[in-house]
Swiss-Prot record:
This is Putrescine aminotransferase. Its cofactor is pyridoxal 5'-phosphate. The lineage of its organism: Bacteria, Pseudomonadati, Pseudomonadota, Gammaproteobacteria, Enterobacterales. Catalyzes the aminotransferase reaction from putrescine to 2-oxoglutarate, leading to glutamate and 4-aminobutanal, which spontaneously cyclizes to form 1-pyrroline. This is the first step in one of two pathways for putrescine degradation, where putrescine is converted into 4-aminobutanoate (gamma-aminobutyrate or GABA) via 4-aminobutanal. Also functions as a cadaverine transaminase in a a L-lysine degradation pathway to succinate that proceeds via cadaverine, glutarate and L-2-hydroxyglutarate. Pyridoxal 5'-phosphate binds at residues 150-151, 274, 332. It is an enzyme of class 2 (transferase).
Length: 459
C-alpha cells in the first residue's frame, strides 16, 4: 500500500530532533530511547546495511554505538556516556581534533554575518582561501576550485585534465591498482575496487590501472598507450594509498612518476584527500619527495572536522582552460563562506601549532609500538606500517582484523578497517593526540591482542 505524505508526522519528527539538538545532556531514559530510535530509523529510512557493518564497534554485539558528542579534541562520547579515544578520525577529517575551538569560532563568527554567498557578488573568503592555498601548496599550483567532498575534488581534476588535454588529442587516464579516489562515476572509474565498480559498469572509458609502486609498469603503460594512439592525458594516484591499506610506495616512486609524466606530456594528478593537511608529517605527502603535481586534490581535513569542503588546485597553465567560461564546472555550495572560514582556520591551526611535525613525532611513537606488537604476536599480526599519523596494522586474515576492532572498542579506542583491504585496520587519529593518549592506545592494542590470542587458543 502506498503511504500518503504526512506533514504532521514530518513536523513532529523534525521538532523532536530540534529538541535533541538543543539539549546539552540526556538522562538515562532519554539515551535509551534515542538509541532505539536511531537504530529503527537507520533500518527503515537510511540503510539497514550500515547496522551490520557497525557491529564491530558494539560492546554488546548488537549494533553500532550511537554517537552523541565530542568529548575533547581527541575523544568521542556515546549516548551511554562512554568516552573513546578516536583513532579513526572520521576517516581522516579530524586532523585538528574534534570541535577545535579556533575552527568552531571562525565558523560561528561567519555564521553571524553571512552563512552562504549570493552566487552573484564576489565572496571574500573564497578569494582568501584560494590565495592561502596558492601560498601553502608546492610548486606552481595557483588556482583553486572549491567543492564539498573528496570525490567532487577528483571529478573536477579529471574534467580539468580532459579540458586541457583534449585539444592535444590525449584522452586516456592511468590510475593504480588498490587506488581509491571516490565513488561518483568519474572518480569510481579511477578507483580500483571491484566491489564498488561492478554494480555500475560500464564506467567511463579510457581508464587503465597499473600496479601501485611499480615504476616499470607505469612506463610500460605510457609506452603502450603512445604506440596505440591512446595518448595519456593524466596519471592519477595517491602518494600513499589510504583505503588500499596504507600502502607506501618505494622511495623515489613519486619522483619517477613525475619524470615519466614530463617525458610523455601527461599531467600528474595527486589525490591528497586523505594524506594532505599534515597527516603524514608534512603538510602534503608529496613534499616528502619534493614532487610538484599539476593538479592537487584536497578534502576531508581541509574543513577542520567542522565543515565539508574540497579543493582542486592547479597550475595556471592547466586551470586557464576555464578562464573564458568559468561556468564550465561549478557547484552551488562549493567554497561557501562557512566552509571557507573553517578551512582558513584549519590551516592557521596546522601552521601555528606545527601539527605536521607533531604528526611525524607521535606517528613514529605509535608505529614503533605497533611494530613491537607485531613481533610479539606474529601469529596474529602480519605487519604494522605507515607514515606520520596514517598507519595500518595488517592481520593474517580478515576475521582477526574484525575481532581486533571489536576488542579495541571494548578498550574504548575507536578504529576501523580500510575499504579496499579487509585484513587491515587503519590507525588515523587526530594530529592533536597527546603523548599520554598514544601510550594508552598502544596499551589497549596489547590488551586486545592478548585477549584475541586467548580466544584463538581456547577455540
Amino acid at each position: 500500500m502506498n503511504r500518503l505524505p504526512s506533514s504532521a508526522s514530518a513536523l513532529a519528527c523534525s521538532a523532536h530532533a530540534l529538541n535533541l539538538i538543543e539539549k546539552r545532556t540526556l538522562d538515562h531514559e532519554e539515551m535509551k530511547a534515542l538509541n532505539r530510535e536511531v537504530i529503527e530509523y537507520f533500518k527503515e529510512h537510511v540503510n539497514p546495511g550500515f547496522l551490520e557493518y557497525r557491529k564491530s564497534v558494539t560492546a554488546g554485539g548488537d549494533y553500532g554505538a550511537v554517537e552523541w558528542q565530542a568529548g575533547s579534541l581527541n575523544t568521542l562520547v556515546d549516548t551511554q556516556g562512554q568516552e573513546f579515544i578516536d583513532c579513526l578520525g572520521g576517516f581522516g577529517i579530524f586532523n585538528v581534533g574534534h570541535r577545535n575551538p579556533v575552527v568552531v569560532s571562525a565558523v560561528q563568527n561567519q555564521l553571524a554575518k553571512q552563512p552562504l554567498h549570493s552566487q552573484e557578488l564576489l565572496d571574500p573568503l573564497r578569494a582568501m582561501l584560494a590565495k592561502t592555498l596558492a601560498a601553502l601548496t608546492p610548486g606552481k599550483l595557483k588556482y583553486s576550485f572549491f567543492c564539498n567532498s573528496g570525490t567532487e575534488s577528483v571529478e573536477a581534476a579529471l574534467k580539468l585534465a580532459k579540458a586541457y588535454q583534449s585539444p592535444r588529442g590525449k584522452f586516456t587516464f592511468i590510475a593504480t591498482s588498490g587506488a581509491f579516489h571516490g565513488k561518483s562515476l568519474g572518480a569510481l572509474s579511477a578507483t580500483a575496487k571491484s566491489t564498488f565498480r561492478k554494480p555500475f559498469m560500464q564506467l567511463l572509458p579510457g581508464f587503465r590501472h597499473v600496479p601501485f609502486g611499480n615504476i616499470e609498469a607505469m612506463r610500460t603503460a605510457l609506452n603502450e598507450c603512445k604506440k596505440t594512439g591512446d595518448d595519456v592525458a593524466a596519471v592519477i594516484l595517491e602518494p600513499i594509498q589510504g583505503e588500499g591499506g596504507v600502502i607506501l610506495p618505494p622511495p623515489g616512486y613519486l619522483t619517477a612518476v613525475r619524470k615519466l609524466c614530463d617525458e610523455f606530456g601527461a599531467l600528474m594528478i595527486l589525490d591528497e584527500v586523505q594524506t594532505g593537511m599534515g597527516r603524514t608529517g608534512k603538510m602534503f605527502a608529496c613534499e616528502h619527495e619534493n614532487v610538484q603535481p599539476d593538479i592537487l586534490c584536497l578534502a576531508k581535513a581541509l574543513g577542520g572536522g567542522v565543515m565539508p569542503i574540497g579543493a582542486t588546485i592547479a597550475t595556471e597553465e592547466v586551470f586557464s582552460v576555464l578562464f573564458d567560461n568559468p561556468f564550465l564546472h561549478t557547484t552551488t555550495f562549493g567554497g561557501n563562506p562557512l566552509a571557507c572560514a573553517a578551512a582558513l582556520a584549519t590551516i592557521n591551526v596546522l601552521l601555528e601549532q606545527n601539527l605536521p611535525a607533531q604528526a611525524d613525532q607521535k606517528g613514529d611513537m605509535l608505529l614503533d609500538g605497533f611494530r613491537q606488537l607485531a613481533r610479539e604476536y606474529p601469529d596474529l599480526v602480519q605487519e604494522a606500517r605507515g607514515k606520520g599519523m596514517l598507519m595500518a596494522i595488517e592481520f593474517v586474515d580478515n576475521e582477526i582484523g574484525y575481532n581486533f576492532a571489536s576488542e579495541m572498542f571494548r578498550q574504548r579506542v575507536l578504529v576501523a578497517g580500510t575499504l579496499n583491504n579487509a585484513k587491515t585496520i587503519r590507525i588515523e587519529p587526530p594530529l592533536t593526540l597527546t603523548i599520554e593518549q598514544c601510550e594508552l592506545v598502544i596499551k589497549a592494542a596489547r590488551k586486545a591482542l592478548a585477549a584475541m590470542r586467548v580466544s584463538v587458543e581456547e577455540a
